[in-house]
Amino acid sequence: MIKKGIILAGGYGTRMSPLTKAVNKQLLPIYDKPLIYYPISILMLAGIKEILIIVNKGQLYQFKKLLSDGKRFGIKINYLEQNKPRGLPDAFILGEKYIGKEKVALILGDNFFYGQSLTAKLKSCVKLSNGCKVLIHPVSKPELYGVAKIDKKGKILSIREKPKKSLSNLAITGLYF
């Protein structure tokens, strides 16, 4: 059973500049709450109560000021700073001590998830005993996303980031179990 989660909250948010020159984009308000609350909520819906948030160097204070240790949400939040955003593999390298020998969920800090059966799907993903699950979703313009090619059983055969020639129309959502 997956009990720990990692949220990638680094990046520079260059497309949201000048707002992101002073504030990490995951701390900007989206509707009635900061963006970072959305991925935290997804992990909580899955039953995950221990979360590691990886942030840019120099932005740790802002996250701690907003979220503290997570107790008021009924969870435990740990933090790590990274010198430079280096993507998904770096999250596992940086979080090695936090992860230990346990399985973890990983979610990008700037994605939204919704759907009628989302909670049930999340709860089934955390029960995964072997292998992994990568949540995918059909899109009309796959060239704008990371895309997965899958076989008839749903096994991922390959993943390409923003392919010029489409492998499929199945976009990688940024949620991994």
Task: Specify the residue positions occupied by each region the protein language model found.
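Conserved N-terminal catalytic core of the sugar/cofactor nucleotidyltransferase
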Residues: 1-7, 15-18, 28-29, 33-108, ...
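Active-site glycine-centered loops adjacent to acidic/histidine catalytic or metal-binding residues
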Residues: 11, 110, 138
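Short, flexible helix/strand-to-coil boundary loops that buttress conserved ligand/catalytic motifs
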Residues: 20, 67, 160-163
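Conserved core of the sugar-phosphate nucleotidyltransferase
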Residues: 114-177
